[in-house]
């Protein structure tokens, strides 16, 4: 059944309105991406300095000495808790997704590859503890009857450092209470405006040996004088290091999210433009057919009158 000119015209108008919306959303996402990239550049300098100090302490064997002494603190996050290692019975996964859709394959990629990582390491529902930052990940696991031990929704478009302190405090407390024995952060790492890659980072326990042996810190010397004591220094720097890991992951994930949203909206706008072009061609053909029919009818009527 042929579509009438009016129906085609309505579809063209509707598609143009949709294209205006997706174009506006693309511009918003691009602006957010530029904003968070400027913010991230400054933060990376801080994060690298903190990691360098922790690596320095690891090479000085001060971190292992602190664990041996079990130096506790009255502060919310204890350095000894962050360093304490024990046999792994349960593994926690802090999964970072977005709160909404319209981000292409961003969320499905994180969830799928996190599940693949769990399967590869033999972690089942019984020994995998899910902690979700972002509503999409939380809803996914809940809809599949998987308990979500912790969720955090409403992360800002450009997250602040204070936002993640609640997350770090909560997951550290859960680790101290032995709700899980190790914790991984799973998220999409921003590569460029067109692509991202899945990344898994071990957050807890903080591995001093891993940092000390990291090739990136080979030039770090192992001579540190600490005041007032190694324990006091660790108590200050290790919570900051844990916060920097989580904050850095969330910043990275948010950057990838904005890039994915911008790319998805650009693709939607391009598809809308192609559809409009096809509909306009279809409309013009219908108009041409109608005009040809009218001319034929007029010519036929005139011939009948002669």
UniProtKB/Swiss-Prot annotation:
Gene Ontology biological process: proton motive force-driven plasma membrane ATP synthesis
CDD domains reported for this sequence: F1-ATPase_gamma
Subunit structure: F-type ATPases have 2 components, CF(1) - the catalytic core - and CF(0) - the membrane proton channel. CF(1) has five subunits: alpha(3), beta(3), gamma(1), delta(1), epsilon(1). CF(0) has three main subunits: a, b and c.
Name of protein: ATP synthase gamma chain
Species whose genome carries this gene: Pediococcus pentosaceus (strain ATCC 25745 / CCUG 21536 / LMG 10740 / 183-1w)
Compartments where located: Cell membrane
Keyword field: ATP synthesis, Cell membrane, CF(1), Hydrogen ion transport, Ion transport, Membrane, Transport
Family to which the UniProt record says this protein belongs: Belongs to the ATPase gamma chain family.
Gene: atpG
């Amino acid at each position: 059944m042929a579509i009438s000119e009016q129906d085609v015209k309505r579809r063209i108008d509707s598609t143009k309105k949709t294209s205006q919306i997706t174009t506006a959303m693309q511009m918003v996402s691009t602006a957010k991406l530029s904003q968070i990239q400027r913010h991230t550049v400054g933060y990376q300098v801080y994060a690298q300095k903190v990691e360098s100090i922790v690596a320095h302490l690891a090479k000085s064997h001060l971190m292992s000495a602190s664990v041996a002494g079990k130096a506790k603190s009255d502060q919310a996050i204890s350095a000894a808790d962050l360093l304490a290692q024990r046999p792994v019975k349960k593994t926690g996964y802090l999964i970072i997704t977005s709160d909404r859709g319209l981000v292409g394959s961003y969320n499905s990629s994180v969830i799928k590859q996190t599940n693949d990582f769990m399967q590869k390491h033999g972690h089942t529902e019984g020994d995998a503890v899910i902690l979700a930052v972002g509503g999409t990940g939380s809803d996914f696991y809940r809809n599949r009857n998987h308990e979500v031990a912790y969720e955090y929704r409403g992360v800002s478009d450009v997250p602040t450092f204070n936002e993640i302190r609640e997350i770090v405090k909560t997951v550290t407390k859960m680790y101290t209470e032995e709700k899980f024995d190790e914790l991984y952060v799973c998220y999409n790492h921003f590569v460029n405006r067109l692509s991202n890659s899945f990344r898994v980072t071990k957050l807890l326990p903080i591995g001093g040996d891993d940092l000390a042996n990291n090739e990136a810190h080979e030039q770090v010397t192992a001579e540190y004088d600490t005041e007032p004591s190694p324990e006091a220094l660790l108590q200050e720097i290790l919570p900051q290091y844990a916060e920097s890991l989580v904050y850095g992951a969330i910043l990275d994930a948010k950057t990838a999210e904005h890039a994915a949203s911008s790319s998805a909206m650009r693709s939607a706008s391009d598809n809308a433009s192609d559809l409009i072009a096809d509909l306009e061609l279809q409309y013009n053909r219908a108009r041409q057919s109608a005009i040809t029919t009218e001319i034929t009818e007029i010519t036929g009527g005139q011939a009948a009158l002669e």
